[in-house]
């Protein structure tokens, strides 16, 4: 474990490169299907395999998705771009090159704002967002002796999101990746599943003494299949680099892989320079021209974004930052909440129900909100039933909500059928209080002798006697009045 005093001497500098597979029906430059989970090497064609004489055709949806992400990150959308070939030889790259954007990325600049657990915000600047195609996948753990190659992924369209070196800790990297995943899901351009490889991250990490004027030696870390593993890999690499320098060693610019089982990084190769890839213009694709009308069309179709919803919930609906952050963590949850508040003005209650009972049920059943059996209108009806004083929150949660999970009836219909509507009949309230007090004379005497905490006992007995059909606040006050006589 690295001593905190030693660590505090150094500044950590991190830049992240995120590759997001786009949710298009077909691949970037061919009509091959873009799907995950099919049998190996079944989603390929002569174009994917790089056969002589085949020509790429641009998938226009990838341009729309790139613009969508660029707008969400306040990037500059380039008017004219050229494509390039990135050349290298590897078994899972049948063409021997990837089509990418080298000197003219579709998006430049921009930023993504991250939040820490205390609500503090920090902008992470973006260098660029560019389009490219994915390589195939080498599989090392099926055959003992051979590496197998699946080319289904080859040619899948990617967006590479490159940050400036603004990230200063593993926790900030975690927060940034969480925001990226949330954003691409809101935009419907990537499913964000790191476990399936549709969102991948490479981290460039260096350390420098706090009074130094030049960055330290950069090390790239790959092979991280979850946001948590990115955080673990960065944390290990920071400690490794500082310990090496403190022991008088030197660092090499290299690429390292993260071993999730051991929690360490291991050296893969000396880091390549850009000229090692021999970039040159892609001769088979014309320049891409993007006009303001194209950008305006995408802008008009943009969905609500998490930051805008967060500001709406905190500033307009007066929800806490905690509630707003949790509601916007999932696009589907946020959209469900939006539907609920169309039918009720008690925004806080709507948030509480969704983050409480609704999410608990989803977690217990292992389902998403899309499969939740209570639609937004019916949940709003339940909330309104409580607001109107017709049922208590306890009765709603314990009796009506469970019944709604297995019925298509409204909350009011279920409450009436189960005889749960709260009574306002004073005679019935007085009769229930008399029954409770007459049945518990010893507890009444103790209460009158100063054991005021027994009010909880009397409340429990009263709610049983009344069948929970009296407003708890009304019942509490009526009980206190009777006990003080």
What residue ranges belong to the model's regions?
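Basic, nucleic-acid-interacting segments
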Residues: 1-304, 321, 342-346
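Core structural elements
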Residues: 197-209, 314-336, 347-364, 377-379, ...
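Extended hydrophobic-aromatic, low-complexity segments
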Residues: 288-289, 324, 336-338, 349-350, ...
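Extended, structured, electrostatic nucleic-acid-contact surfaces
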Residues: 307-314
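Structural motif
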Residues: 318-319, 341-350, 388-391, 449-452
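Strongly charged, low-complexity linkers/loops
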Residues: 370-380, 390-464
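Short, amphipathic C-terminal "tail helix"
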Residues: 452-485
